[in-house]
Amino acid sequence: MKKRILAWGAASLLLASSLAACGPKATTETEKKAESGKASEAASEKAEGAFEDEALKADLKLYTYPIGKWGDSASVDSLLQNFNAKYPDIHVTVEYLDYQSGDDQVNTAIEGNAAPDLIMEGPERLVANWGAKGLMVDLADLFEDDAAKDIYPNVVEACKSSEGKYYEYPLAMIAHCMAINKTAFENADALQYLDLDNHTWTTENFFKAVKALHDKGQENVVAVYCGGQGGDQGTRALVNNLYGGKFTNKEHTEYAVDSSENAQALEELVKAEGINFDPALVGGDEITLFRNGTLAMSLCWNSAQQNNKDNGEAGKTNNGDEIIPMLFPAKDGKAELCGGIWGFGIFDNGDENKVKAAKAFIRFMANDAEQAKLSVQTTGFFPVHKDLTDVYEGTENAETMKLFTEKFMPSFGDYYQVTPGWATARTEWWNMLQRIGQGGDVKTELTTFQTNANAAAKA
Protein backbone atom coordinates (compact mmCIF):
# COMPACT_ATOMS: atom_id res chain seq x y z
CA MET A 1 0.00 0.00 0.00
CA LYS A 2 1.23 3.44 -0.83
CA LYS A 3 2.16 5.53 2.18
CA ARG A 4 -0.37 8.07 3.43
CA ILE A 5 0.57 11.69 3.97
CA LEU A 6 -0.62 13.49 7.09
CA ALA A 7 -2.74 16.50 6.14
CA TRP A 8 -2.32 19.59 8.26
CA GLY A 9 -5.41 21.43 7.14
CA ALA A 10 -7.47 22.43 4.17
CA ALA A 11 -7.13 25.50 2.03
CA SER A 12 -9.03 25.68 -0.11
CA LEU A 13 -11.43 29.28 -26.92
CA LEU A 14 -12.15 30.64 -30.25
CA LEU A 15 -14.01 32.83 -32.56
CA ALA A 16 -14.05 35.56 -35.19
CA SER A 17 -16.93 38.00 -35.32
CA SER A 18 -18.77 38.37 -38.61
CA LEU A 19 -19.81 41.82 -39.71
CA ALA A 20 -22.18 42.43 -42.61
CA ALA A 21 -21.78 45.71 -44.45
CA CYS A 22 -24.39 47.25 -46.70
CA GLY A 23 -23.69 49.86 -49.33
CA PRO A 24 -25.53 53.19 -49.24
CA LYS A 25 -28.68 53.72 -51.33
CA ALA A 26 -30.77 56.68 -52.30
CA THR A 27 -33.94 57.14 -50.30
CA THR A 28 -36.98 59.34 -50.73
CA GLU A 29 -38.09 61.85 -48.13
CA THR A 30 -41.03 59.58 -47.28
CA GLU A 31 -38.71 56.62 -46.75
CA LYS A 32 -36.47 58.74 -44.57
CA LYS A 33 -39.39 59.78 -42.40
CA ALA A 34 -40.61 56.20 -42.14
CA GLU A 35 -37.16 54.94 -41.17
CA SER A 36 -36.80 57.76 -38.68
CA GLY A 37 -40.13 56.88 -37.15
CA LYS A 38 -39.19 53.21 -36.83
CA ALA A 39 -35.88 54.13 -35.25
CA SER A 40 -37.57 56.43 -32.77
CA GLU A 41 -40.12 53.76 -31.95
CA ALA A 42 -37.40 51.16 -31.42
CA ALA A 43 -35.40 53.52 -29.25
CA SER A 44 -38.50 54.30 -27.24
CA GLU A 45 -39.27 50.62 -26.73
CA LYS A 46 -35.69 49.97 -25.72
CA ALA A 47 -35.71 52.83 -23.24
CA GLU A 48 -39.05 51.67 -21.85
CA GLY A 49 -37.70 48.14 -21.50
CA ALA A 50 -34.60 49.39 -19.72
CA PHE A 51 -36.77 51.46 -17.38
CA GLU A 52 -38.97 48.48 -16.60
CA ASP A 53 -35.88 46.35 -16.03
CA GLU A 54 -34.35 48.79 -13.59
CA ALA A 55 -37.70 49.22 -11.84
CA LEU A 56 -37.90 45.51 -10.99
CA LYS A 57 -38.56 44.63 -7.39
CA ALA A 58 -37.56 41.26 -6.00
CA ASP A 59 -35.82 39.49 -3.17
CA LEU A 60 -33.35 36.98 -4.57
CA LYS A 61 -31.16 34.35 -3.00
CA LEU A 62 -27.80 33.55 -4.59
CA TYR A 63 -25.81 30.43 -3.79
CA THR A 64 -22.15 30.67 -4.78
CA TYR A 65 -19.34 28.18 -4.57
CA PRO A 66 -15.88 29.52 -3.61
CA ILE A 67 -14.90 30.69 -7.09
CA GLY A 68 -11.95 32.91 -6.29
CA LYS A 69 -13.12 35.83 -4.18
CA TRP A 70 -16.75 35.07 -5.04
CA GLY A 71 -16.50 33.00 -1.90
CA ASP A 72 -15.50 36.06 0.13
CA SER A 73 -18.39 38.07 1.55
CA ALA A 74 -16.54 41.41 1.55
CA SER A 75 -15.70 41.06 -2.14
CA VAL A 76 -19.22 40.00 -3.10
CA ASP A 77 -20.75 42.79 -1.01
CA SER A 78 -18.78 45.28 -3.09
CA LEU A 79 -20.17 43.79 -6.30
CA LEU A 80 -23.69 43.89 -4.91
CA GLN A 81 -23.31 47.56 -4.04
CA ASN A 82 -22.59 48.23 -7.71
CA PHE A 83 -25.64 46.21 -8.69
CA ASN A 84 -27.92 47.99 -6.24
CA ALA A 85 -26.77 51.37 -7.48
CA LYS A 86 -28.60 50.46 -10.71
CA TYR A 87 -31.22 48.11 -9.30
CA PRO A 88 -32.06 49.45 -5.85
CA ASP A 89 -35.18 47.33 -5.47
CA ILE A 90 -33.61 43.94 -6.23
CA HIS A 91 -32.24 42.64 -2.97
CA VAL A 92 -29.79 39.74 -3.17
CA THR A 93 -28.84 37.65 -0.17
CA VAL A 94 -25.91 35.29 -0.56
CA GLU A 95 -25.18 31.86 0.84
CA TYR A 96 -21.56 30.78 0.55
CA LEU A 97 -20.97 27.11 -0.22
CA ASP A 98 -17.87 24.95 -0.16
CA TYR A 99 -17.00 21.97 -2.33
CA GLN A 100 -17.29 19.45 0.48
CA SER A 101 -20.91 19.99 1.43
CA GLY A 102 -22.18 22.49 -1.14
CA ASP A 103 -23.91 19.97 -3.39
CA ASP A 104 -25.71 18.46 -0.42
CA GLN A 105 -26.87 21.92 0.66
CA VAL A 106 -28.26 22.66 -2.78
CA ASN A 107 -29.97 19.29 -3.08
CA THR A 108 -31.49 19.66 0.39
CA ALA A 109 -32.85 23.08 -0.58
CA ILE A 110 -34.32 21.63 -3.78
CA GLU A 111 -35.99 18.78 -1.90
CA GLY A 112 -37.45 21.29 0.55
CA ASN A 113 -38.85 23.47 -2.27
CA ALA A 114 -36.44 26.20 -1.19
CA ALA A 115 -33.95 26.23 -4.06
CA PRO A 116 -32.06 29.49 -4.53
CA ASP A 117 -33.06 31.82 -7.33
CA LEU A 118 -29.50 32.18 -8.60
CA ILE A 119 -26.52 29.89 -8.39
CA MET A 120 -22.92 30.37 -9.47
CA GLU A 121 -20.83 27.39 -10.56
CA GLY A 122 -19.93 25.44 -13.70
CA PRO A 123 -21.75 23.51 -16.46
CA GLU A 124 -21.04 20.18 -14.78
CA ARG A 125 -23.51 21.16 -12.08
CA LEU A 126 -25.81 23.70 -13.73
CA VAL A 127 -26.15 21.94 -17.11
CA ALA A 128 -25.29 18.27 -16.64
CA ASN A 129 -26.87 17.89 -13.21
CA TRP A 130 -29.64 20.27 -12.16
CA GLY A 131 -30.35 21.39 -15.71
CA ALA A 132 -30.65 17.81 -16.94
CA LYS A 133 -33.18 17.22 -14.17
CA GLY A 134 -35.39 20.02 -15.47
CA LEU A 135 -34.79 22.30 -12.51
CA MET A 136 -33.23 25.25 -14.30
CA VAL A 137 -34.50 28.12 -16.45
CA ASP A 138 -33.51 28.13 -20.13
CA LEU A 139 -31.30 31.21 -20.63
CA ALA A 140 -31.37 31.14 -24.44
CA ASP A 141 -32.62 34.74 -24.56
CA LEU A 142 -29.47 35.95 -22.81
CA PHE A 143 -27.34 34.42 -25.56
CA GLU A 144 -29.40 36.35 -28.13
CA ASP A 145 -28.22 39.66 -26.66
CA ASP A 146 -25.60 41.55 -28.67
CA ALA A 147 -23.41 41.44 -25.56
CA ALA A 148 -23.16 37.65 -25.86
CA LYS A 149 -21.87 37.57 -29.44
CA ASP A 150 -18.19 37.56 -28.46
CA ILE A 151 -18.31 34.65 -26.00
CA TYR A 152 -15.96 31.88 -27.11
CA PRO A 153 -17.93 29.21 -29.02
CA ASN A 154 -16.54 26.31 -26.99
CA VAL A 155 -17.73 28.01 -23.83
CA VAL A 156 -21.20 28.60 -25.28
CA GLU A 157 -21.42 24.92 -26.22
CA ALA A 158 -20.48 23.88 -22.70
CA CYS A 159 -23.39 25.92 -21.35
CA LYS A 160 -25.91 24.15 -23.59
CA SER A 161 -27.64 20.88 -22.82
CA SER A 162 -27.97 18.00 -25.27
CA GLU A 163 -31.57 19.22 -25.82
CA GLY A 164 -30.28 22.63 -26.88
CA LYS A 165 -31.26 24.53 -23.75
CA TYR A 166 -28.89 26.94 -22.07
CA TYR A 167 -28.76 26.46 -18.34
CA GLU A 168 -25.71 28.58 -17.61
CA TYR A 169 -24.57 32.05 -18.62
CA PRO A 170 -20.76 32.14 -18.35
CA LEU A 171 -18.56 34.73 -16.71
CA ALA A 172 -15.04 33.37 -16.37
CA MET A 173 -12.82 30.48 -17.40
CA ILE A 174 -9.48 28.93 -16.50
CA ALA A 175 -7.12 26.15 -17.52
CA HIS A 176 -5.99 24.22 -14.45
CA CYS A 177 -2.36 23.19 -14.18
CA MET A 178 0.23 21.97 -11.71
CA ALA A 179 3.17 23.64 -9.96
CA ILE A 180 6.63 22.84 -8.65
CA ASN A 181 8.85 24.14 -5.86
CA LYS A 182 11.83 25.66 -7.68
CA THR A 183 14.20 25.42 -4.70
CA ALA A 184 13.45 21.73 -4.17
CA PHE A 185 14.07 21.08 -7.87
CA GLU A 186 17.31 23.06 -7.79
CA ASN A 187 18.58 21.13 -4.78
CA ALA A 188 17.85 17.84 -6.55
CA ASP A 189 19.31 19.04 -9.89
CA ALA A 190 15.87 18.38 -11.39
CA LEU A 191 15.31 21.67 -13.23
CA GLN A 192 17.08 20.05 -16.18
CA TYR A 193 13.91 18.03 -16.77
CA LEU A 194 11.72 21.10 -17.33
CA ASP A 195 11.21 23.28 -20.39
CA LEU A 196 10.94 26.49 -18.41
CA ASP A 197 10.45 28.66 -21.49
CA ASN A 198 7.18 26.90 -22.29
CA HIS A 199 6.38 25.53 -18.83
CA THR A 200 6.15 22.00 -20.24
CA TRP A 201 7.79 18.61 -19.69
CA THR A 202 7.58 15.10 -21.01
CA THR A 203 6.32 12.04 -19.17
CA GLU A 204 9.82 10.60 -19.12
CA ASN A 205 11.27 13.73 -17.59
CA PHE A 206 8.48 13.95 -15.04
CA PHE A 207 9.37 10.56 -13.63
CA LYS A 208 13.07 11.42 -13.76
CA ALA A 209 12.36 14.52 -11.72
CA VAL A 210 10.33 12.56 -9.18
CA LYS A 211 13.19 10.10 -8.78
CA ALA A 212 15.78 12.86 -8.41
CA LEU A 213 13.74 14.58 -5.72
CA HIS A 214 13.07 11.36 -3.84
CA ASP A 215 16.72 10.33 -4.01
CA LYS A 216 17.62 13.73 -2.57
CA GLY A 217 15.50 13.03 0.49
CA GLN A 218 12.10 14.42 -0.50
CA GLU A 219 9.95 11.62 0.85
CA ASN A 220 6.67 13.01 -0.44
CA VAL A 221 7.15 14.45 -3.92
CA VAL A 222 3.59 14.15 -5.28
CA ALA A 223 0.31 13.30 -3.60
CA VAL A 224 -2.39 11.57 -5.61
CA TYR A 225 -5.07 12.92 -3.30
CA CYS A 226 -8.28 10.92 -3.30
CA GLY A 227 -10.26 11.79 -0.19
CA GLY A 228 -13.10 13.30 -2.20
CA GLN A 229 -13.86 15.23 -5.36
CA GLY A 230 -12.17 18.49 -4.33
CA GLY A 231 -9.49 19.33 -6.87
CA ASP A 232 -10.01 16.09 -8.79
CA GLN A 233 -9.33 17.88 -12.09
CA GLY A 234 -5.65 17.59 -11.10
CA THR A 235 -5.56 13.82 -10.71
CA ARG A 236 -7.65 13.35 -13.86
CA ALA A 237 -5.31 15.57 -15.88
CA LEU A 238 -2.22 13.80 -14.56
CA VAL A 239 -3.47 10.32 -15.39
CA ASN A 240 -4.91 11.24 -18.81
CA ASN A 241 -1.92 13.25 -20.01
CA LEU A 242 0.91 10.89 -19.05
CA TYR A 243 0.26 8.48 -21.93
CA GLY A 244 -2.55 10.15 -23.89
CA GLY A 245 -5.59 8.62 -22.23
CA LYS A 246 -9.09 10.09 -22.30
CA PHE A 247 -11.81 10.49 -19.71
CA THR A 248 -14.83 10.41 -22.04
CA ASN A 249 -15.55 9.93 -25.72
CA LYS A 250 -15.61 12.98 -27.99
CA GLU A 251 -19.40 13.08 -28.04
CA HIS A 252 -19.59 13.28 -24.24
CA THR A 253 -22.04 10.40 -24.10
CA GLU A 254 -19.96 7.84 -22.21
CA TYR A 255 -16.82 7.43 -20.13
CA ALA A 256 -13.65 6.04 -21.67
CA VAL A 257 -11.27 5.75 -18.72
CA ASP A 258 -10.75 1.99 -19.09
CA SER A 259 -7.91 2.13 -21.60
CA SER A 260 -4.36 0.85 -21.90
CA GLU A 261 -3.07 4.43 -21.79
CA ASN A 262 -4.73 5.21 -18.48
CA ALA A 263 -3.77 1.81 -17.08
CA GLN A 264 -0.13 2.45 -17.90
CA ALA A 265 -0.27 5.85 -16.26
CA LEU A 266 -1.75 4.52 -13.05
CA GLU A 267 0.65 1.59 -12.90
CA GLU A 268 3.64 3.90 -13.27
CA LEU A 269 2.31 6.26 -10.60
CA VAL A 270 1.83 3.37 -8.18
CA LYS A 271 5.38 2.12 -8.76
CA ALA A 272 7.16 5.45 -8.46
CA GLU A 273 8.85 6.15 -5.13
CA GLY A 274 7.85 9.57 -3.87
CA ILE A 275 4.35 9.43 -5.37
CA ASN A 276 1.80 8.54 -2.72
CA PHE A 277 -1.91 7.86 -3.04
CA ASP A 278 -3.52 9.51 -0.03
CA PRO A 279 -7.19 8.91 0.88
CA ALA A 280 -7.01 11.56 3.62
CA LEU A 281 -6.42 14.45 1.22
CA VAL A 282 -8.46 16.52 -1.20
CA GLY A 283 -7.12 19.30 -3.39
CA GLY A 284 -7.18 22.00 -0.74
CA ASP A 285 -5.20 19.86 1.68
CA GLU A 286 -2.65 19.10 -1.01
CA ILE A 287 -2.17 22.80 -1.69
CA THR A 288 -1.49 23.37 2.01
CA LEU A 289 1.15 20.63 2.04
CA PHE A 290 2.76 22.04 -1.09
CA ARG A 291 2.89 25.52 0.35
CA ASN A 292 4.45 24.35 3.60
CA GLY A 293 7.15 22.31 1.84
CA THR A 294 5.87 18.80 2.59
CA LEU A 295 5.28 18.24 -1.13
CA ALA A 296 7.55 19.30 -3.99
CA MET A 297 4.70 19.51 -6.51
CA SER A 298 1.02 20.39 -6.59
CA LEU A 299 -1.50 18.91 -9.03
CA CYS A 300 -4.14 21.44 -8.00
CA TRP A 301 -2.95 24.79 -9.35
CA ASN A 302 -4.10 27.72 -11.46
CA SER A 303 -3.63 31.47 -11.76
CA ALA A 304 -5.64 32.17 -8.62
CA GLN A 305 -3.34 29.96 -6.57
CA GLN A 306 -0.28 31.59 -8.13
CA ASN A 307 -1.61 35.00 -7.11
CA ASN A 308 -2.65 33.91 -3.63
CA LYS A 309 -1.10 35.88 -0.76
CA ASP A 310 -2.85 34.32 2.22
CA ASN A 311 0.39 32.87 3.59
CA GLY A 312 2.96 35.30 2.22
CA GLU A 313 4.21 36.69 -1.06
CA ALA A 314 2.33 35.66 -4.19
CA GLY A 315 4.14 33.00 -6.21
CA LYS A 316 6.06 31.80 -3.16
CA THR A 317 5.72 28.98 -0.66
CA ASN A 318 5.28 29.77 3.02
CA ASN A 319 9.06 29.94 3.52
CA GLY A 320 9.72 31.96 0.37
CA ASP A 321 10.59 29.30 -2.22
CA GLU A 322 9.60 30.27 -5.77
CA ILE A 323 6.61 28.44 -7.23
CA ILE A 324 6.74 27.68 -10.96
CA PRO A 325 3.43 26.79 -12.63
CA MET A 326 3.71 23.91 -15.10
CA LEU A 327 1.54 22.14 -17.63
CA PHE A 328 1.00 18.47 -16.89
CA PRO A 329 3.59 16.05 -18.26
CA ALA A 330 2.71 14.39 -21.56
CA LYS A 331 4.47 11.83 -23.70
CA ASP A 332 5.12 14.44 -26.40
CA GLY A 333 5.17 17.37 -23.99
CA LYS A 334 1.83 18.68 -25.31
CA ALA A 335 -0.68 18.47 -22.52
CA GLU A 336 -4.42 19.12 -22.59
CA LEU A 337 -5.49 20.97 -19.48
CA CYS A 338 -8.76 20.49 -17.70
CA GLY A 339 -10.68 23.69 -17.96
CA GLY A 340 -13.04 25.40 -15.64
CA ILE A 341 -16.00 27.55 -16.70
CA TRP A 342 -18.01 29.48 -14.15
CA GLY A 343 -21.16 31.47 -14.49
CA PHE A 344 -24.74 31.82 -13.35
CA GLY A 345 -27.86 29.73 -13.54
CA ILE A 346 -31.44 30.35 -12.44
CA PHE A 347 -33.55 27.76 -10.67
CA ASP A 348 -37.12 27.56 -11.97
CA ASN A 349 -39.04 28.43 -8.82
CA GLY A 350 -42.20 29.39 -10.70
CA ASP A 351 -41.90 33.13 -10.10
CA GLU A 352 -41.56 35.00 -13.40
CA ASN A 353 -40.79 38.29 -11.68
CA LYS A 354 -37.87 36.71 -9.85
CA VAL A 355 -36.64 35.17 -13.09
CA LYS A 356 -36.64 38.62 -14.72
CA ALA A 357 -34.78 40.08 -11.76
CA ALA A 358 -32.27 37.23 -11.79
CA LYS A 359 -31.63 37.77 -15.51
CA ALA A 360 -31.04 41.46 -14.81
CA PHE A 361 -28.47 40.41 -12.21
CA ILE A 362 -26.71 38.13 -14.68
CA ARG A 363 -26.68 40.71 -17.47
CA PHE A 364 -25.21 43.29 -15.11
CA MET A 365 -22.53 41.07 -13.61
CA ALA A 366 -21.47 39.34 -16.84
CA ASN A 367 -22.18 41.81 -19.67
CA ASP A 368 -21.91 45.36 -18.33
CA ALA A 369 -18.64 46.63 -19.81
CA GLU A 370 -17.18 47.99 -16.58
CA GLN A 371 -18.80 45.66 -14.09
CA ALA A 372 -17.88 42.50 -16.01
CA LYS A 373 -14.20 43.34 -15.56
CA LEU A 374 -14.68 43.59 -11.81
CA SER A 375 -16.76 40.41 -11.76
CA VAL A 376 -14.04 38.51 -13.62
CA GLN A 377 -11.29 40.00 -11.47
CA THR A 378 -13.12 38.71 -8.43
CA THR A 379 -12.87 35.16 -9.78
CA GLY A 380 -9.13 35.52 -10.35
CA PHE A 381 -9.66 33.83 -13.72
CA PHE A 382 -10.12 34.90 -17.35
CA PRO A 383 -13.05 36.46 -19.25
CA VAL A 384 -15.22 34.35 -21.54
CA HIS A 385 -15.83 37.47 -23.65
CA LYS A 386 -13.21 37.70 -26.40
CA ASP A 387 -13.54 41.48 -26.52
CA LEU A 388 -13.25 41.95 -22.77
CA THR A 389 -9.53 42.69 -22.74
CA ASP A 390 -7.07 44.22 -20.29
CA VAL A 391 -9.04 42.90 -17.34
CA TYR A 392 -5.94 42.81 -15.16
CA GLU A 393 -4.02 45.69 -16.74
CA GLY A 394 -2.58 47.91 -14.06
CA THR A 395 -3.18 45.39 -11.28
CA GLU A 396 -0.54 43.65 -9.22
CA ASN A 397 -1.46 40.37 -10.92
CA ALA A 398 -0.95 41.62 -14.49
CA GLU A 399 2.34 39.76 -15.09
CA THR A 400 1.06 36.45 -13.80
CA MET A 401 -2.17 36.70 -15.78
CA LYS A 402 -0.20 37.49 -18.93
CA LEU A 403 1.90 34.36 -18.33
CA PHE A 404 -1.17 32.17 -17.93
CA THR A 405 -2.88 33.76 -20.95
CA GLU A 406 0.11 33.03 -23.17
CA LYS A 407 1.37 29.69 -21.84
CA PHE A 408 -1.58 27.89 -20.30
CA MET A 409 -4.91 29.01 -21.77
CA PRO A 410 -4.01 27.80 -25.31
CA SER A 411 -3.90 24.27 -23.86
CA PHE A 412 -7.50 24.45 -22.61
CA GLY A 413 -8.71 20.94 -23.40
CA ASP A 414 -12.00 19.18 -23.99
CA TYR A 415 -14.73 20.26 -21.56
CA TYR A 416 -16.03 16.78 -20.87
CA GLN A 417 -17.61 17.59 -17.51
CA VAL A 418 -21.02 17.88 -19.20
CA THR A 419 -21.15 14.12 -19.82
CA PRO A 420 -24.29 12.58 -18.26
CA GLY A 421 -23.69 10.91 -14.92
CA TRP A 422 -20.94 13.35 -14.05
CA ALA A 423 -21.64 13.45 -10.32
CA THR A 424 -21.42 9.67 -10.11
CA ALA A 425 -18.30 9.57 -12.27
CA ARG A 426 -16.50 11.99 -9.95
CA THR A 427 -17.30 9.83 -6.94
CA GLU A 428 -16.26 6.68 -8.79
CA TRP A 429 -12.98 8.36 -9.70
CA TRP A 430 -11.70 9.11 -6.23
CA ASN A 431 -12.97 5.79 -4.91
CA MET A 432 -11.09 4.04 -7.70
CA LEU A 433 -7.90 5.90 -6.82
CA GLN A 434 -8.29 4.90 -3.19
CA ARG A 435 -8.62 1.22 -4.08
CA ILE A 436 -5.63 1.36 -6.42
CA GLY A 437 -3.57 3.10 -3.74
CA GLN A 438 -4.48 0.34 -1.33
CA GLY A 439 -3.18 -2.33 -3.71
CA GLY A 440 -6.15 -2.92 -6.00
CA ASP A 441 -5.50 -4.25 -9.49
CA VAL A 442 -5.39 -1.30 -11.88
CA LYS A 443 -7.19 -2.99 -14.78
CA THR A 444 -9.92 -4.34 -12.53
CA GLU A 445 -10.49 -0.97 -10.91
CA LEU A 446 -10.61 0.86 -14.24
CA THR A 447 -13.26 -1.59 -15.45
CA THR A 448 -15.27 -1.07 -12.27
CA PHE A 449 -15.10 2.69 -12.70
CA GLN A 450 -16.22 2.57 -16.30
CA THR A 451 -19.07 0.14 -15.63
CA ASN A 452 -20.49 2.23 -12.81
CA ALA A 453 -19.95 5.60 -14.46
CA ASN A 454 -21.53 4.53 -17.74
CA ALA A 455 -24.48 3.02 -15.92
CA ALA A 456 -25.09 6.46 -14.43
CA ALA A 457 -24.63 8.10 -17.82
CA LYS A 458 -27.38 5.92 -19.29
CA ALA A 459 -29.75 6.18 -16.34
Per-segment meaning from a language model:
Residues 4-9, 16, 22-128, 147-148, ...:
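Conserved N-terminal structural module of periplasmic/extracytoplasmic solute-binding proteins
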Residues 43-54, 122-177, 320-329, 393-396, ...:
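Hinge/lid segment of periplasmic solute-binding proteins
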Residues 53, 138-151, 195-199, 222-225, ...:
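Short, solvent-exposed loop/beta-turn-alpha elements that line the ligand-binding surface or hinge
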Residues 82, 86-151, 165, 187-189, ...:
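Extracytoplasmic "Venus flytrap"/periplasmic binding protein-like
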Residues 85, 91, 267, 271-275, ...:
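Extracytoplasmic/periplasmic substrate-recognition and gating elements
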Residues 163-171, 176, 202-254, 295:
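Extracytoplasmic/periplasmic solute-binding protein
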Residues 207-212, 251-283:
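Glycine-centered hinge/linker elements that transmit conformational signals in sensory
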Residues 323-327, 376-431, 435:
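Long, aromatic- and glycine/proline-rich binding clefts that accommodate carbohydrate-like moieties
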